[in-house]
């Protein structure tokens, strides 16, 4: 197996979380998915592993933060142009994300929005 990075995240609602990451461009990898987890690949080597809270707790004794209240991590996804950034954000909103909790930034060489 080639080297990969899988960012493990707790998911309160596995189906809704899976739909959200699919909307962002992830592809479900059935090899690493099941009733308590979903693996979504963004490239051949980079993915997100969503785990139900019960399954996530098998790996840590630390409390699971509330993703709606607490910052848990920040992820940056690249896109080919400004329109692709806006389209990705629109898909994420349809899948349950909240658009622009922070103002959009246009730095000339880079345009970003937040979900």
What positions do the PLM features span?
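Core segments of cupin and vicinal oxygen chelate
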Residues: 8-57
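Residues at or immediately preceding the N-termini of alpha-helices
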Residues: 14, 82-83
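Short beta-strand-to-loop capping motifs
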Residues: 11, 77-80
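Vicinal oxygen chelate
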Residues: 40, 48, 89-115
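Short amphipathic alpha-helices within nucleic acid-binding modules
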Residues: 20, 83-89
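Short amphipathic alpha-helical segments
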Residues: 3-7, 69-75
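Short hydrophobic/aromatic beta-strand or adjacent loop that forms the aromatic wall/cage
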Residues: 35-37, 72, 110-112
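Short beta-strand/turn micro-motifs at beta-sheet edges
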Residues: 59-65
């Amino acid at each position: 197996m080639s080297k990969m990075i899988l960012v493990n995240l707790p998911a309160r609602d596995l189906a809704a979380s899976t739909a959200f990451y699919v909307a962002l461009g992830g592809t479900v990898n059935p090899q690493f998915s099941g009733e308590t987890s979903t693996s979504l690949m963004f490239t051949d080597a980079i993915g997100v592993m969503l785990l139900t809270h019960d399954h996530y707790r098998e790996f840590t004794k630390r409390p699971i933060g509330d993703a709606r209240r607490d910052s848990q991590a920040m992820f940056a996804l690249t896109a080919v142009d400004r329109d692709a950034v806006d389209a990705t954000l629109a898909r994420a909103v349809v899948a349950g994300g909240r658009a622009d909790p922070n103002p959009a930034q246009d730095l000339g060489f880079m345009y970003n929005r937040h979900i």
